Amino acid sequence: MAYSLWNDQIVEEGSITISPEDRGYQFGDGIYEVIKVYNGHMFTAQEHIDRFYASAEKIRLVIPYTKDVLHKLLHDLIEKNNLNTGHVYFQITRGTTSRNHIFPDASVPAVLTGNVKTGERSIENFEKGVKATLVEDVRWLRCDIKSLNLLGAVLAKQEASEKGCYEAILHRGDIITECSSANVYGIKDGKLYTHPANNYILNGITRQVILKCAAEINLPVIEEPMTKGDLLTMDEIIVSSVSSEVTPVIDVDGQQIGAGVPGEWTRKLQKAFEAKLPISINA
């Protein structure tokens, strides 16, 4: 039996009823997070929870629980489901009220939900690399907020899937931003390039870990926008997210990247990232 988070309770998944007038359902008026679980333990849990509260503040949504309470609820949800390896997803909406674009009265309670998903690490992708395609970035201008409004990303990801690609690498005009569900990096002449963390991208928690890994292996980081031309001439390309970890891209729209296999710096980053997993798990 599967269990879900329903506000401050862990309940049977099938017992939850969402109102058709929930603002998340009608407006996408809410935020979410996804945390990777290894061996029953959340990885970088505090960073994800901190970002959850930061996103809530940006959209003026009050979370009616402390960070410590939320952390305990997520821990209990994982334990109740006996989750070993996978993800825990949680979201909060601005609550249920008659449909109106204007915020509801402060007395309307927010609605917190969460669930878990079992899933092993994508070792084959890490080892062999994946294909990607370039797609115009048509999302809104507050990509730094982990909003429930994901239609632009959904359309891009679908386009990539239909082309037989793992990811859609997004660009606004000629400038590379990120992917439909990941951050993107290029490595050229021993330097790591990635878009700066501003409103055009989500400052991924995995991204933050990777930048620390780069410093540890003496790989200089340049946070500057890349052009499409820059990207296609990189020696190596990687994408990162909670599920992707450090995934090499070996082909973009049929153009081989580097030698067409995961590169030396990618392997070093993967090794440095992997080394952090037990550190966080035991923290």
Swiss-Prot record:
Stored SUPFAM superfamilies: D-aminoacid aminotransferase-like PLP-dependent enzymes (SSF56752)
Domain of life (superkingdom): Bacteria
SUBUNIT field: Homodimer.
Binding annotation for pyridoxal 5'-phosphate: R51, E178
UniProt keyword DNA damage present: no
One BP term from GO: D-amino acid catabolic process
Function: Acts on the D-isomers of alanine, leucine, aspartate, glutamate, aminobutyrate, norvaline and asparagine. The enzyme transfers an amino group from a substrate D-amino acid to the pyridoxal phosphate cofactor to form pyridoxamine and an alpha-keto acid in the first half-reaction. The second half-reaction is the reverse of the first, transferring the amino group from the pyridoxamine to a second alpha-keto acid to form the product D-amino acid via a ping-pong mechanism. This is an important process in the formation of D-alanine and D-glutamate, which are essential bacterial cell wall components.
Annotated positions binding substrate: Y32, R99, H101
Cofactor: pyridoxal 5'-phosphate
Cytoplasm listed as a keyword: no
PROSITE patterns listed in its UniProt record: AA_TRANSFER_CLASS_4
Listed Pfam families: Aminotran_4
GO molecular function term, any single one: pyridoxal phosphate binding
Record protein name field: D-alanine aminotransferase
Reactions that this protein is recorded to catalyse: D-alanine + 2-oxoglutarate = D-glutamate + pyruvate
Gene name for this UniProt entry: dat
Alphabetized InterPro entries for the sequence: Aminotrans_IV, Aminotrans_IV_CS, Aminotransferase-like, BCAT-like_C, BCAT-like_N, Class-IV_PLP-Dep_Aminotrnsfr, D_amino_transT
Organism: Lysinibacillus sphaericus (Bacillus sphaericus)
Residues annotated as the enzyme's active site: K146
Family, per entry: Belongs to the class-IV pyridoxal-phosphate-dependent aminotransferase family.
EC number, as in UniProt: 2.6.1.21
Cellular component aspect of the GO annotation: cytosol
Keywords: Aminotransferase, Pyridoxal phosphate, Transferase
